[in-house]
């Protein structure tokens, strides 16, 4: 599965972006580093 990181500009707030980055980090820990 290929994960595409969304740019900061696609989020309406910095908080949403930070939450997204945390979720990505959890995903990487669970499944290994995805291919971008």
UniProtKB/Swiss-Prot annotation:
Tissue specificity note: Central and peripheral nervous system, and muscular pharynx.
Compartment(s) where it occurs, according to its Swiss-Prot or TrEMBL record: Secreted
InterPro entries in alphabetical order: Pancreatic_hormone-like (IPR001955), Pancreatic_hormone-like_CS (IPR020392)
Residues forming coiled coils: none
Primary location recorded for the protein, binned into one broad class: secreted
GO terms, biological process: neuropeptide signaling pathway
GO CC, one annotated term: extracellular region
Keyword Zinc: no
Sites bearing Phenylalanine amide, chain numbering: 36
Superkingdom to which the source organism belongs: Eukaryota
Any one GO molecular-function label of the UniProt entry: hormone activity
Stated family: Belongs to the NPY family.
Name of protein: Neuropeptide F
Organism this protein belongs to: Arthurdendyus triangulatus
């Amino acid at each position: 599965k290929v994960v595409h990181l969304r740019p900061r500009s696609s989020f309406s707030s910095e908080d949403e972006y930070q939450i997204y980055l945390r979720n990505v980090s959890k995903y990487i820990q669970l499944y290994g580093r995805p291919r971008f």
